[in-house]
Design a protein with these regions (language model features):
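ABC transporter nucleotide-binding domains
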Residues: 2-4, 9-204, 208-210
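ABC transporter nucleotide-binding domain
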Residues: 170-263
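C-terminal coupling/interaction segments
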Residues: 264-315
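A generic structural signal for secondary-structure junctions
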Residues: 77, 103, 119, 140, ...
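Non-catalytic surface loops within mature trypsin-like serine protease
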Residues: 26, 122, 231-233, 264-266, ...
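Short beta->alpha junction loops/turns
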Residues: 65, 104, 232-234, 265, ...
Length: 315
C-alpha cells in the first residue's frame, strides 16, 4: 500500500531522513513513531507529496507517487493534527464544498451518512467556529472520508483531545479499518498506537530503527520478563529462597505483591507456582507483565538501538 525505498531528505547540511525503507501492507493499521526531530513529519510530508525527497522512491498502491500524483491523491484521505477549517461556514456547507472538489455523487446522502456516523448530524447547521476541538477533529475525519479513500494517513489524530474524544476517534479508526481501509498513523500517544496497530515503525535520528509487531518487538528487546505474584504465608525466609532461584534476576516487594524479574528464555510461571506450593505458600494471583510499546520505544530511542529483521539488536 505504501513503500519507501532508500528515501532521503537533506536540508543544506542537515539530513532529516536517511535511507528510509518502510512497508505498509494493505488492510493494516501501521503506527509510525519517533521522538521529536526523528524525521516523522518530514517523511509524512514526502509521502503526501508536499515535500520532494532528495533521493529514493515512494510507492503508493504500487505506483511511483510522482507518476500518477493526482490519481493517487484521489484514493487517499488525510487527517492532520490541526484542522484548518473555514470557521465562518457551517459543517454542512464546508463538507458540501469538498464534495464538489472531489466530485462526490449523491453528496447530500453522503454528508448526512457521515455526520450521523460521528454523531454531529444535529449540529450540521452550526458554524465550525463554534465547534469544540474534538468536534472539529471529527469533521476532519468526515472530510477525509468523503472521497471513499482506500488509504487513510493520520498525523497525530488524537492530539489535544480529552479521553472521550480519544475513544471516539479510536473507535472511528477501527471501524474504518474493519471496512477495509489501510491506516498509516503517527501519534505521540503510544498507548493508543499499541491498542489498535497491527505493526509499528519507529524512527530515530532520521533512520528507521524498528518495524515489527508488538509481540516480535518484545521478543527482540526483552532479556527478562516481569511476573507479579500475590501470595500469603510468605515469610522473609521464603523471600530469600525466591531470590536464590536460578532463573530469578531480582525480586521487589510492591504494595503487598512481589514483582519477580526472570529470564526471558522460557515461561517460568509454572516453576513459580510449584515453588510457592512447595514452601507452603498460598498463591492468590500470578500475572505476567508484558513490555508495553512505551517501554519498547524508550528502550530503542534512549539506548540508540536498531533492530534488524534477523532479530539482531545493534547499539
Amino acid at each position: 500500500m505504501i513503500r519507501t525505498e532508500n528515501l532521503c531528505k537533506k536540508y543544506e547540511k542537515v539530513e532529516a531522513v536517511k535511507d528510509l525503507s518502510i512497508s505498509v501492507e494493505p488492510g493494516e493499521i501501521y503506527g509510525f513513531l519517533g521522538p521529536n526531530g526523528a524525521g516523522k513529519t518530514t517523511t509524512i510530508m514526502m509521502i503526501l507529496g508536499i515535500l520532494k525527497p532528495t533521493s529514493g522512491k515512494i510507492l503508493v498502491f504500487n505506483k511511483d507517487l510522482y507518476s500518477d500524483y493526482f490519481g493517487i491523491k484521489r484514493r487517499v484521505g488525510v487527517v492532520s493534527e490541526v484542522q484548518y477549517l473555514y470557521e465562518d461556514m457551517t459543517a454542512y456547507e464546508y463538507l458540501s464544498f469538498f464534495c464538489d472538489i472531489y466530485n462526490v455523487k449523491n453528496k447530500k446522502e453522503k454528508i448526512e451518512e457521515l455526520l450521523h456516523k460521528v454523531d454531529l448530524y444535529d449540529r450540521k447547521d452550526d458554524l465550525l467556529g463554534h465547534y469544540s476541538r474534538g468536534m472539529q477533529q471529527k469533521i476532519g475525519f468526515v472530510r477525509a472520508l468523503l472521497n471513499d479513500p482506500e488509504l487513510l494517513i493520520l498525523d497525530e489524530p488524537v492530539s489535544g483531545l480529552d479521553p472521550t474524544g480519544i475513544r471516539e476517534v479510536r473507535d472511528l479508526i477501527l471501524e474504518e479499518n474493519q471496512r477495509g481501509r489501510t491506516v498509516f498513523m503517527s501519534s505521540h500517544i503510544l498507548s493508543e498506537v499499541e491498542r489498535i496497530s497491527h505493526r509499528v515503525g519507529i524512527m530515530n535520528k532520521g533512520r528507521l530503527v524498528a518495524e515489527d509487531t508488538m509481540e516480535n518487538l518484545r521478543k527482540k528487546l526483552s532479556s527478562e520478563v516481569e511476573i507479579e505474584l500475590e501470595v500469603d504465608n510468605f515469610d522473609v525466609e521464603a523471600e530469600k529462597r525466591l531470590e536464590s532461584l536460578s532463573f530469578v534476576n531480582s525480586v521487589i516487594k510492591e504494595d503487598g505483591k512481589y514483582l519477580v524479574r526472570v529470564k526471558a528464555d522460557k515461561d517460568y510461571r509454572g516453576d513459580l507456582v510449584n515453588f510457592v506450593s512447595a514452601i507452603g505458600g498460598n498463591l492468590k494471583e500470578i500475572r505476567k507483565r508484558e513490555m508495553s510499546l512505551e517501554d519498547a520505544f524508550i528502550t530503542i530511542t534512549e539506548k540508540n538501538i536498531s533492530l534488524f529483521s534477523s532479530g539482531e539488536v545493534s547499539e
